[in-house]
Amino acid sequence: MKYTSYILAFQLCIVLGSLGCYCQDPYVKEAENLKKYFNAVDPDVADNGTLFLDILRNWKEESDRKIMQSQIVSFYFKLFKNFKDDQRIQKSVETIKEDINVKFFNSNKKKWDDFEKLTNYSVTDLNVQRKAVHELIQVMAELSPAAKIGKRKRSQMFRGRRASQ
């Protein structure tokens, strides 16, 4: 009886392992379709190195990688936007965008919408330029980790004083 359960477990592992080879993420097939469309399978594509992969390899910390990934995702969204009306790759683009939504935005629609909103701002629009410059000081303050830590320490210090009084 004991050997039978081992054999069944072994067979299950073999079946699941073989299924894993055939159950690729949907984006893989669609990315291959885009490679054919853009003629990105030719060896000359690799000339002069990679666009993104070397940059991603340079950064090991999660927060640093997220910054780089956000710029890369932004690039792909702009690329896809340029080809949104091409019916030959419409399905591939939509599938990949959905997969990015799951992997990068954790299926959070609000994050995705805000990200797209940011990537759609035109830097040549005078009104956008004026608003961006108007908000620059506040944005810079948000970027500074020292300011956030200082605020947190002060608020903890005041909370401690109130509790002891």
From Swiss-Prot:
First and last residue of the signal peptide: 1-23
Q: Give the similarity note.
A: Belongs to the type II (or gamma) interferon family.
* Assembly mode: Homodimer. Interacts with IFNGR1 (via extracellular domain); this interaction promotes IFNGR1 dimerization.
An example of a GO molecular function for this protein is: cytokine activity
Source domain of life: Eukaryota
Matches recorded under SUPFAM superfamilies? 4-helical cytokines
Q: What Gene3D superfamilies does the annotation carry?
A: 1.20.1250.10
- What's a single GO BP term from this record? macrophage differentiation
Listed GO CC annotations: extracellular space
| TM ranges | none
Report keywords, A-Z: Antiviral defense, Cytokine, Glycoprotein, Growth regulation, Pyrrolidone carboxylic acid, Secreted, Signal
Q: Per its database record, what is this protein's job?
A: Type II interferon produced by immune cells such as T-cells and NK cells that plays crucial roles in antimicrobial, antiviral, and antitumor responses by activating effector immune cells and enhancing antigen presentation. Primarily signals through the JAK-STAT pathway after interaction with its receptor IFNGR1 to affect gene regulation. Upon IFNG binding, IFNGR1 intracellular domain opens out to allow association of downstream signaling components JAK2, JAK1 and STAT1, leading to STAT1 activation, nuclear translocation and transcription of IFNG-regulated genes.
Q: Which residues are glycosylated?
A: N48, N120
Record bears the keyword Cell wall biogenesis/degradation: no
Where it mainly occurs, coarsely classed, is: secreted
Q: What is this protein called?
A: Interferon gamma
Please name the source species. Answer: Papio anubis (Olive baboon)
Q: Where is this chain's protein located in or outside the cell?
A: Secreted
Query: What is the phylogenetic placement of the source species in the record?
Result: Eukaryota, Metazoa, Chordata, Craniata, Vertebrata
Modified residue Pyrrolidone carboxylic acid is at which positions? Answer: Q24
